[in-house]
Amino acid sequence: MIRTHDAGSLRATDAGSTVTLAGWVARRRDHGGVIFVDLRDGSGVAQVVLREEDAHVLRNEYCVRVTGEVTRRPEGNENPELATGEVEVTAEELEVLSEAAPLPLPVDDQIEAGDDVRLRYRYLDLRRSGPASALRLRSAANQIARTVLHERDFLEIETPTLTRSTPEGARDFLVPVRLQPGTWYALPQSPQLFKQLLMVGGMERYYQIARCYRDEDFRADRQPEFTQLDIEMSFVTEDDVIDLGEAIVSRLWRELAGHQITRPIPRITWHEAMARYGSDKPDLRYGVELTELTDYLRGTRFRVFAGAIEAGGYVGAVVMPGGAAQSRKELDGWQDWAKARGAKGLAYVVLDAETGEARGPVAKNLSTEHLAGLADVVGAKPGDAIFFAAGAESRAAQELLGAARVEIARRANLVDESAWAFCWVVDAPMFERVTDREEAGAGGWTAVHHPFTAPNAEWMDRFEEAPDRALAYAYDIVCNGNEIGGGSIRIHRGDVQQRVFDLLGITPEQARDKFGFLLEAFKYGPPPHGGIAFGWDRVCMLLAGADSIREVIAFPKTRGGFDPLTAAPTPITAAQRLEAGVDARPKPEARAQAGTAGPAAPVADPT
């Protein structure tokens, strides 16, 4: 054994004992013939006292082994900021296990470094307490989730990561098959179809911490490879899945964030979330709700609002508390903010702090009658600003106001950063119209989630009558404006599945090609089933108090999908390309077999 104790485990009760420690030189301080070294390992830091002649070669991040006696620090020299701050180790033996070159990245929590440097030297970055504690928290989260699920008799089952390409919204990462030139595997975007097959197979309660891959345009805080806590259950209702989701989340937040979540977690419908917050993942740590003004402003002569109302669209508003104090430049800046989001602008009025009189471009275009009651309708006070959005499409206008709501909360310091606010968003739309014929298929509609999501009871028998209003047994859990998990009850009846395919314009041939193996399995008594998947990177990010999912991933990539550590992705050689069969054309028989399950194999006679 190289060491007898962890550096961070030493306490005053260990005084008088001889220990052997191993770790890195975190800091060195010379004091006239004596050198003090902060020795760091994965458990923490211990102070080691060495003779100068023994330790003069030591530099930061040398890896060393020290044997010595634990003694109490002299009175007045204790360090209350360290768990080991009452003691030190007087070294009797020192062994340099390996030396360290000059550091490209300071291994110091007090010194910030750029993301590119941190990712390029991630192994050094992980020696810092912040990044290291984030990964330890993630490991603890994994263990807690497994404990909750095993308490409920779930099975941890691995599903393939080399599979066939199926449509799930984003592009697949494709892998050429050397032994079958011209054919390709796909890395899974989720274990969705396999976990449903496990339900057909009678596994009933499945989970895995699954690696998933999506070749999508990089935006916001995304990674091309990510992790889900993936769950599926047989013979369950929506309430059963939600109850399990709450059990997992409440245990995680209690043990890792010290926060007791009040259960049941509130539920709001998707349409209510859009109407009140302009988002299907609302941040409930603050108020500032949207107000629809379509009926209130009916009859207005202001062309922007009148045009939207006449088109059967939407006019709404959101209030910025104290917003009237903004300068003209700041108010004009909101127009640039809106245009950056694809809108034409963001109309506004400000209410005089003394008189409450409405001023601004919109005020000049509204009637005295409409202006008189406006503040009461939207809940504004003197000194506030009111922002408006209008459009023939309600959702786009609501989403613009929803984004404004978030920006208002940020600028007006309305967010309690120490608070946790959870909700479920339920009864999501089942379909949405798509104008891209290639994406939508012959039906002109696409599934909001996936084509195996079940309609809710109200729409089960009539979703074809009004696809734009049909609701699904789909549910998302939201924390502080972040969607951290989502799922649905699945279709298990063949007649309902066929009706969905018909609406989506998916022909029997296309269905067999895309989902043949699943449809074949569904001929043999599939149980009612449903599930949920948690975005594990985002869950851990929130628990760690981090600003990006990169902080809780061991070796993350940049926003452009580049890995500064390994310089991946890289070109392949001509020889590799030829051997992998990248340019080969598939044989006709391989194309004919794709996606078909074929006839069922004969069942052996048990006698």
Swiss-Prot record:
Keyword ATP-binding carried by entry: yes
Region (Aspartate): 192-195
Keywords: Aminoacyl-tRNA synthetase, ATP-binding, Cytoplasm, Ligase, Nucleotide-binding, Protein biosynthesis
Basic and acidic residues bias: start-end ranges: 580-590
Feature type site, description Important for tRNA non-discrimination: H31, G76
Cellular-component GO terms for this entry: cytoplasm
Reaction equations catalysed: tRNA(Asx) + L-aspartate + ATP = L-aspartyl-tRNA(Asx) + AMP + diphosphate
GO biological process, one term: aspartyl-tRNA aminoacylation
PANTHER family registered for this protein in UniProt: ASPARTATE--TRNA LIGASE, MITOCHONDRIAL, ASPARTYL/LYSYL-TRNA SYNTHETASE
NCBIfam families named in the record: aspS_bact, PRK00476.1
Function description: Aspartyl-tRNA synthetase with relaxed tRNA specificity since it is able to aspartylate not only its cognate tRNA(Asp) but also tRNA(Asn). Reaction proceeds in two steps: L-aspartate is first activated by ATP to form Asp-AMP and then transferred to the acceptor end of tRNA(Asp/Asn).
Sequence similarity: Belongs to the class-II aminoacyl-tRNA synthetase family. Type 1 subfamily.
Protein name: Aspartate--tRNA(Asp/Asn) ligase
